[in-house]
Structure formats: C-alpha cells, structure tokens
From Swiss-Prot:
Source organism phylogeny: Bacteria, Pseudomonadati, Pseudomonadota, Gammaproteobacteria, Alteromonadales
Main function: Part of the twin-arginine translocation (Tat) system that transports large folded proteins containing a characteristic twin-arginine motif in their signal peptide across membranes. TatA could form the protein-conducting channel of the Tat system.
Membrane association type: Single-pass membrane protein
Stated name of the protein: Sec-independent protein translocase protein TatA
Manganese as UniProt keyword: no
Sequence intervals crossing the membrane: 1-21
Subunit structure comment from the entry: The Tat system comprises two distinct complexes: a TatABC complex, containing multiple copies of TatA, TatB and TatC subunits, and a separate TatA complex, containing only TatA subunits. Substrates initially bind to the TatABC complex, which probably triggers association of the separate TatA complex to form the active translocon.
GO molecular function: protein transmembrane transporter activity
Biased composition range(s): Polar residues: 57-66
Length: 79
C-alpha cells in the first residue's frame, strides 16, 4: 500500500537506463566505486597511523622507564 514494490523499482530502473544510457551509468558506477574505495583506504591508513603513533609512544615510555632503572641498579652494585 504505502511501500514501493519490486515492480515499481524495476520500472524506475528501466526509465533511468533509457534516459542516461548504460555507458554513462557504468562510468558513474565506476566513479562511485572508486570514491568509496578511496574513502575506505583513507580510513584504514588513518587508523594504522594512529596505531603506529600509539605503539611508538608506548615503546618510548618503556625505554625511558628502563633507562631510569639501570642507573639505580648500577649504584646498588657499586655500593
């Protein structure tokens, strides 16, 4: 009643194909697919950059903690 049936969708698709042609629709679909792929790649690279930065920060913190512990142990050995 209030919804769109499959037949109505098919008629709309047929009209769109007749108006624009298959070549133009194919190129439009390719452009849209490329845009979605580029967006996904950007999101993935942004996430991996954040993970790399967090890993570097944690390694720097561990290194500084180890550097602080080493002089104390040397002082104890010398005393």
């Amino acid at each position: 009643m209030g919804g769109i049936s499959i037949w109505q969708l098919l008629i709309i698709a047929l009209i769109v194909i007749l108006l624009f042609g298959t070549k133009k629709l194919r190129s439009l679909g390719g452009d849209l697919g490329g845009a979605v792929k580029g967006f996904k790649n950007a999101m993935t690279s942004e996430t991996s950059e954040e993970e790399k930065k967090a890993l570097e920060d944690s390694q720097t913190a561990q290194t500084s903690q180890q550097a602080e512990k080493k002089p104390e142990s040397k002082d104890k050995e010398q005393a």
